[in-house]
Amino acid sequence: MSTATRSVAPRAHVLVAVKELHAAKTRLSGVFDTDDRTGLVLSMLRDTLAVVSDVATVVGVTVVTPDPAVARLARSVGAHVYADPAPVAAGDPADEGGTEHGLNAALAAAAEHVRRNESGVDVVALQADLPSLRGGEFGEALAAARTGGRSVVVDHHGTGTAALFSCDPEVPLDPRFGPGSAKRHLESGARPLDGHWPGLRTDVDTADDLDAAQALGVGPATRAALDALEHSAPSHCGNE
């Protein structure tokens, strides 16, 4: 396994995992009702997909999901869909912790599928809720990741994972998303990437996260969703 900078032209395939919409962003339930939260999740996904799809070194984007509405959105913007075969029913005890385990398994399978079909491609697992992401940030992170092996961009809280990279065909993606994922990824051998990429690091799980994203500036779909909901500055909620 080489850790030297690779000389071949960079090519990356981005995987974006989205759980079933009823289980998504439950920590925003004090700010938005279920329908509004669903609309916001889809809007943030749309903005995230638009940004990464425009990065020159990205040759493919796949959304990993069991949710048909998410799959429809993904296909409508030109992304591939890899179906997570194990959706979780509302109220199921696996709704929280089990969901992450299922999506990690689906991400790993999707990464293997991509590498079987696209020889030599770098694989990235990216959060779906990055409404402030900029293409330049993501391009810089990709370049930094290509110095070899498996690497991670830790989120703005310092505990979660915004993006996980595998830039060596011999190194599995080995996703370990879920609460405290940054520590698990680092302990499993991923190296931290230290660039100043605030939009890439600001994933949205709480009202405070949404405030932070809006301070950076959000993408057009997210902006339109927030304006329609008259929640352009929901700083009063602060769910944890």
Curated annotation (Swiss-Prot):
GO BP: F420-0 metabolic process
Recorded catalytic activity of this chain's protein: phosphoenolpyruvate + GTP + H(+) = enolpyruvoyl-2-diphospho-5'-guanosine + diphosphate
EC number: 2.7.7.105
InterPro entries: CofC, Nucleotide-diphossugar_trans
Pfam families: CofC
Enzyme class, first EC level, given as a word: transferase
Cystine crosslinks: none
Positions that bind phosphoenolpyruvate: 161, 178, 181
GO molecular function, one term: phospholactate guanylyltransferase activity
Pathway listed: Cofactor biosynthesis; coenzyme F420 biosynthesis
Record keywords, A-Z: GTP-binding, Nucleotide-binding, Nucleotidyltransferase, Transferase
Recorded family membership: Belongs to the CofC family.
Described purpose of this protein according to its UniProt entry: Guanylyltransferase that catalyzes the activation of phosphoenolpyruvate (PEP) as enolpyruvoyl-2-diphospho-5'-guanosine, via the condensation of PEP with GTP. It is involved in the biosynthesis of coenzyme F420, a hydride carrier cofactor.
Protein name in the entry: Phosphoenolpyruvate guanylyltransferase
